[in-house]
């Protein structure tokens, strides 16, 4: 695995220097925060800050304090399992949807996101790397618009031998991804899997899709599909390889690396390693 860069009080990591204060950013583990941690944050911002905190777009929390309270505040946060982070040229806090708490979930996105977070958050990279995990194709975490996006979905196929030509599926898909006459699923299928309830001819295989090279911002890009995997261990393996290649050859953002390296070259390299 990629070597972790251990950081504690580092004004470039989790601490943003302002003119008359520090802004501290907490790197939260994906999914949920407990009551004890919320109480600690409330205590800190009430006693050392300006009595308010900001919820970041990556599900983190940040707030202002006076510089002289940095060590004391960090100790209070550490005592309840909270750490500063998610700034600078590092792998940032991993974002997840609510996973199995949602009735649309195809996979446990929270558990996978936490594994990724624990393994890679804080690792040095040429530019910041954002990783988002969605439990289904609804894309609540906008996994196609971040450096590495992960999505649980279904690969749908039609068994032509079982199909009775009943026509139930002909106009069922709002994406028109079912070719009823040829009995195939088109490439624009998102893998939601609702069509599998129509009849036994539809078969669904759960996969974990990885997208790479997306980003938000003023000049946004949609990530490109890299590979479909069958288990979470392989997901961590692929992320490790992506970050290693990016750390070695990357200069701009991950999107620039993918463009320069070539998505087909990247796909071929990853597929060879997964065999």
Swiss-Prot record:
SUPFAM superfamilies documented for this protein: 4Fe-4S ferredoxins (SSF54862), Nitrite and sulphite reductase 4Fe-4S domain-like (SSF56014), Nitrite/Sulfite reductase N-terminal domain-like (SSF55124)
Keyword 4Fe-4S in annotation: yes
Binding-site list for siroheme: 140
Residue sites binding [4Fe-4S] cluster per the record: 97, 102, 136, 140
Pfam families documented for this protein: NIR_SIR, NIR_SIR_ferr
Keyword Metal-binding: yes
Keywords attached to this entry: 4Fe-4S, Heme, Iron, Iron-sulfur, Metal-binding, Oxidoreductase
PROSITE patterns named in the record: 4FE4S_FER_2, NIR_SIR
GO MF, any single term: heme binding
Protein family according to the UniProt entry: Belongs to the nitrite and sulfite reductase 4Fe-4S domain family.
Record protein name field: Uncharacterized protein MJ0551
Annotated source species: Methanocaldococcus jannaschii (strain ATCC 43067 / DSM 2661 / JAL-1 / JCM 10045 / NBRC 100440) (Methanococcus jannaschii)
């Amino acid at each position: 695995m990629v070597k972790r860069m251990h950081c504690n009080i580092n004004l470039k990591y989790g601490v943003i220097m302002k003119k008359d204060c520090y802004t501290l950013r907490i790197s939260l583990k994906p999914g949920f925060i407990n009551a004890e941690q919320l109480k600690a944050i409330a205590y800190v911002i009430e006693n050392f800050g300006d009595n308010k905190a900001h919820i970041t777009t990556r599900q983190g929390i940040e707030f202002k304090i006076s510089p002289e309270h940095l060590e004391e505040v960090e100790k209070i946060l550490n005592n309840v399992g909270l750490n500063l982070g998610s700034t600078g040229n590092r792998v940032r806090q991993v974002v997840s949807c609510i996973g199995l708490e949602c009735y649309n979930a195809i996979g446990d996105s929270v558990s996978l996101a936490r594994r990724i977070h624990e393994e890679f958050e804080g690792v040095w990279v040429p530019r910041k790397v954002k990783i988002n995990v969605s439990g289904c194709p609804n894309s609540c975490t906008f996994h196609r618009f971040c450096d590495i996006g992960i999505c649980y979905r279904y690969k749908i196929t039609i068994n032509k031998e079982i199909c009775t030509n009943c026509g139930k599926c002909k106009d069922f898909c709002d994406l028109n991804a079912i070719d009823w006459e040829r009995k195939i699923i088109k490439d624009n299928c998102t893998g939601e899997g609702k069509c599998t309830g129509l009849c036994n001819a539809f078969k669904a295989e759960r996969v974990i899709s990885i997208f790479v090279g997306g980003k938000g911002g003023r000049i946004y890009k949609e990530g490109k599909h890299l590979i479909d995997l069958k288990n979470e261990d392989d997901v961590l393996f692929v992320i490790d390889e992506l970050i290693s290649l990016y750390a070695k050859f990357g200069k701009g953002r991950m999107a620039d690396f993918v463009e320069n390296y070539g998505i087909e070259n990247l796909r071929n390299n990853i597929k060879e390693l997964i065999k």
